[in-house]
Amino acid sequence: MSGRNKAARILVALGSAVLFASAALHSLAAYPRVSTALGASNLNARLQGPLRAVFLMVGWDWIAIAIVALLAAFTETKLRKILVLFCGLAVLVETALTLAFIGVFLGNEMLGSATVLLMVGGLLLDTASKPQDADAPSEE
């Protein structure tokens, strides 16, 4: 494996770790406060449940994106570069949306750093090498 590929995998792993940390903070630290605030608000009760669900789904979304990026980066597949870049793009869109609707805060700073790590890691990934022909003699 090339040094470039090793660096790419490290960057993708770091980006995924940031997404895991973001999901943990979002789901474990922020959700209880949001849930309490929703209960105390005058928001229609029919909207409180869906908002709680969406809040938790966002954390799950980051976990799923991180897992897909890790699997793609550490598996020799033809699509790994595209998959990691797509994961980075997905987080970039979420970062832009949080900036537009909420403004600058720790959450979108974490998402932004995960985006950069995933995108740079994805760009550095080599395309998967072709599997060696089973009939060809080995070079050992």
Which residue ranges define each predicted feature?
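Helix-boundary and loop/linker segments of multi-pass membrane transporters
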Residues: S2-A8, G39-R46, E76
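Membrane-helix boundary connector in multi-pass membrane proteins
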Residues: K78, L85, L89-L111, L124-Q132
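Interfacial segments of alpha-helical transmembrane regions
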Residues: R4-F20, R80-G88
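Core segments of alpha-helical transmembrane spans in multipass integral membrane proteins
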Residues: A17, A21-R33, L43-F74, F86-V93
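Short, charged juxtamembrane terminal tails flanking transmembrane helices
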Residues: S2-G3, A128-E140
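Alpha-helical transmembrane segments and their membrane-interface exit regions
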Residues: T115-L125
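Juxtamembrane helix-break-helix junctions at the cytosolic face
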Residues: G3-N5, A64-L83, A128
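Membrane-embedded alpha-helical segments of multi-pass membrane proteins
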Residues: A64, N108-L117
